[in-house]
């Protein structure tokens, strides 16, 4: 996809967002329901794509990606109305005779840049949150998970108008073109070096970013632990997804 096509997608989403169509809570809920039904309809395709890209078994695919994503979408559907209501706040002395409220409003046109290690979970969960909050979304899946990217694109094309959600496939050129655009929010999951580049590019427009860049994850084993059970659970957590998990145990702190 070339620069002009990406600019057109972002422009179309911004025009759509300015209609305030996404501000309607019922519209947000309907979008989430469509996402849930599309994921359910393509469960077999998702499992096959994860097997193709990462070698995941169907059980692991459901436990780590399909089932967890559906659970998050259900959670958003159940709570989107409550989250969207104005909240009463205490007033200061100057406004003592007033009623003070805060109202959550959408960011606007958002970008989700997803990784290869959990290509569905780390796309669908932030997508559900963005839709529940009333945003439009451009998704950039990882080029290192092409089968998963193709299924994500199919799911989103079936569930959404491109003015609400669009998937942009490709590699480095598409990443560069996307980061040249002005966004209202960027959600990136990936490496520290690329995260620094995303933050640098976002800073030119003061775009708020959420960067999930992994880290070092301790595992604490205290004196009351059953060592056989603890060892089995630590090994499971470390080698789930062949160790490619940002919160997999990295070191132990043993009492």
Language-model segments: residues:
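ALDH superfamily catalytic-core signature
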Residues: 160, 193-255
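N-terminal Rossmann-like NAD(P)+-binding subdomain of aldehyde/semialdehyde dehydrogenases
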Residues: 1-101
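Residue-level signal for inorganic ion chemistry
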Residues: 28, 73, 134, 165, ...
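Conserved small-residue-rich beta-alpha loop and adjacent elements
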Residues: 91-160, 206, 228
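A structured beta-alpha segment of the ubiquitous adenosine-cofactor-binding alpha/beta core
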Residues: 99-101, 167-184
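Short gly/ser/thr-rich secondary-structure transition/capping motifs
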Residues: 89-97, 167-170, 233-234
């Amino acid at each position: 996809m070339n620069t002009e096509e990406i600019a057109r997608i972002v422009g179309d989403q911004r025009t759509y967002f300015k209609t305030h169509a996404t501000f309607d809570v019922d519209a947000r809920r309907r979008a989430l329901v469509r996402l849930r039904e599309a994921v359910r309809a393509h469960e077999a395709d998702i499992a096959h794509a994860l097997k193709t890209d990462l070698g995941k078994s169907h059980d692991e695919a459901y436990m780590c990606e399909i089932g967890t994503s559906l659970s998050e979408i259900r959670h958003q559907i159940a709570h989107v109305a409550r989250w969207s209501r104005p909240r009463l706040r205490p007033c200061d002395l100057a406004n003592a005779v007033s009623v003070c409220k805060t109202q959550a409003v959408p960011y606007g046109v958002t970008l989700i840049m997803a990784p290869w290690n959990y290509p569905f979970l780390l796309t669908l969960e932030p997508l559900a949150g963005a839709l529940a909050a009333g945003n439009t979304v451009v998704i950039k899946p990882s080029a290192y998970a092409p089968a998963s990217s193709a299924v994500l694109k199919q799911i989103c094309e079936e569930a959404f108008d491109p003015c609400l959600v669009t998937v942009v496939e490709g590699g480095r050129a598409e990443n560069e073109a996307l980061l040249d655009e002005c966004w209202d929010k960027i959600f990136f999951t990936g490496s520290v070096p690329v995260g620094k580049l995303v933050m640098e590019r976002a800073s030119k427009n003061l775009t708020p970013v959420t960067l999930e860049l992994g880290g070092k994850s301790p595992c604490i084993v205290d004196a009351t632990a059953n060592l056989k059970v603890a060892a089995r659970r630590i090994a499971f957590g470390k080698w789930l997804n062949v160790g490619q998990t940002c919160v997999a145990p990295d070191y132990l702190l043993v009492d």
